[in-house]
Amino acid sequence: MNNTSITGPQVLHRTKMRPLPVLEKYCISPHHGFLDDRLPLTRLSSKKYMKWEEIVADLPSLLQEDNKVRSVIDGLDVLDLDETILGDVRELRRAYSILGFMAHAYIWASGTPRDVLPECIARPLLETAHILGVPPLATYSSLVLWNFKVTDECKKTETGCLDLENITTINTFTGTVDESWFYLVSVRFEKIGSACLNHGLQILRAIRSGDKGDANVIDGLEGLAATIERLSKALMEMELKCEPNVFYFKIRPFLAGWTNMSHMGLPQGVRYGAEGQYRIFSGGSNAQSSLIQTLDILLGVKHTANAAHSSQGDSKINYLDEMKKYMPREHREFLYHLESVCNIREYVSRNASNRALQEAYGRCISMLKIFRDNHIQIVTKYIILPSNSKQHGSNKPNVLSPIEPNTKASGCLGHKVASSKTIGTGGTRLMPFLKQCRDETVATADIKNEDKN
């Protein structure tokens, strides 16, 4: 490996070789970020898929009866996707969201998981997922980005019409306010975070323009830091209407995927159709948010692979890189593009004498560290503490927890599990992973003597 240091002009020349990304080319909005400017569809337009809509709307009641949801889904015809869906991306997203909800309900209903999805779900789910460039199960996109509606489209506030009091979910597993709130806090998070994209591109344009005095770079960094601070506060709003025990015992089991699920009787994952292949996928997770990974790219935060944190148990696999596969194709491609041209941290390290620049960048890192501290606090309250409690609870009594690695087939949610072993819905060990992300964020601030030999 060549350890020769790269001079400032060389760094800038290297990144100038490729144009900066244009948000709209990647289905990203300057006003709403990774949320579409158009609201998600609340129903498919064709009556052909009316049964899908009826079942997903009725999931909260169907899941109250043993195997009821499975018997209803098993009675469905296998439907092909027609032009009403194939010709409109919002129809595709709606179909994908519906099928993801039904798939997870079918697998995890009644506490004893099934390892085969019926053809009536498997075939259209595989097709919609392939077209959208996402895995065939419920993801952050289907649960959050494409699963909300506004209650008053005329209501305009600081965040347009997407304030928490003006949005609600389209579908949930449990019908609880807690589950809706869990998704909606992330919707608002994404809306606030749209400013991060604009500030980041402002900084990169200023660096390329050779802005003397770095005024625009500093201004962009200050705006970015202020927005990350707002994101931290938005995250803590989870506590307002989502109870930890309701989340952990009633909601979270349905969010699990089929990775690391041998203890639940899914050693090969789930088979898609009676004649299909077994596939292994991680469940819906905030690690699948393109916004969070955008912040890391902009600020130059590097995350290392760790076998204990990977959902695949492979030290060569970086969990956050893995999660890019769960994002909509265009958003994933945006991250790759941004990563190839982003040189903010390098630029700051080359201008160590500019105190205002150093302080502005340092504040961004400090705010991102606080955000990750808050995330650890939320995870502790909503996952670690309930997992260590003796309370038994679920949408049904004696329901197994698919997200506890030591749960046995004859057991139930109530036994004690060590916090370091607690597995996230994405299949990774939560606290070690989150603390590593936080520590790697802090380490990013140390740039004083970088690139000096």
UniProtKB/Swiss-Prot annotation:
InterPro entries: Indolamine_dOase (IPR000898), Trp/Indoleamine_2_3_dOase-like (IPR037217). It holds the Pfam family IDO. Heme binds at residue 331. It comes from the Eukaryota. It is an enzyme of class 1 (oxidoreductase). GO terms for biological process: 'de novo' NAD biosynthetic process from L-tryptophan; L-tryptophan catabolic process to kynurenine. It catalyses: D-tryptophan + O2 = N-formyl-D-kynurenine; L-tryptophan + O2 = N-formyl-L-kynurenine. Keywords: Dioxygenase, Heme, Iron, Metal-binding, Oxidoreductase. PROSITE patterns: IDO_1 (PS00876), IDO_2 (PS00877). This is Indoleamine 2,3-dioxygenase.
